Amino acid sequence: MSVQIRPPRPGDGEGMARVWLSAGAYYADLDPVHFQLPAAEGLADSFEADIMARNSDADSYGLVAERAGEVAGWLTAHLEHPSPRASYQLIRELGWTRLMVDAVMVDRALWRQGIGTALLTAAESWGRDRGASVVRLSTFPGSPVSMPFYEQHTGYQRRSILFQKPLS
């Protein structure tokens, strides 16, 4: 069955919430210390408002993957422009326009069917058309699904490590 990658439409919030909860359950099971399922109440409205607002901002982007009339996945991203301050340009990429992928979510039942790849490919094209010279994203390093997806299937390379320490 084919997948259509398209801009979001009013009414997509419910499907986006369903996909978020589906993929989120995987992460909550994988590492319950760091992940939890959000309350379902109000989630669809929240996604609806966010995705529509993103596409009214020239530097933000949202996409929906539709399969058989249902939301099968979605992606949000935004552009980060070069920093004009020299103090921020020690890291070379901060002097470039960057595409930051905020989220790539695919219904867990549809993983490994090319939906995530199609969403990323469309986002990369959008960023390239707007002058981005690099795309960045983050993922949970303990995921046996997302790490191979990004590193082996889509050509992304690890570039940094994020540290965290609880303060309580």
Question: What spans do the regions from the language model cover?
Answer:
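Conserved GNAT-fold acetyl-CoA-binding loop/helix
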Residues: 24-50
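Conserved active-site alpha-helix within GNAT-family acetyltransferase domains
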Residues: 117, 129-133, 141-160
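Conserved N-terminal entry element of GNAT/NAT acetyltransferase domains
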Residues: 1-14, 18, 22-25, 29
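Conserved beta-strand-loop-alpha-helix junction that forms the acyl-donor binding cleft
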Residues: 111, 136-146, 164-167
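A short helix-loop-beta-strand connector motif used in the catalytic cores of GNAT acetyltransferases and
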Residues: 49-63, 82, 100
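Conserved acyl-donor/pantetheine-binding loop and adjacent beta-alpha core of acyl/acetyltransferases
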Residues: 76-103
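Conserved acetyl-CoA-binding loop-helix of GNAT-fold acetyltransferases
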Residues: 106, 112-125
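Conserved beta-hairpin
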Residues: 59-75
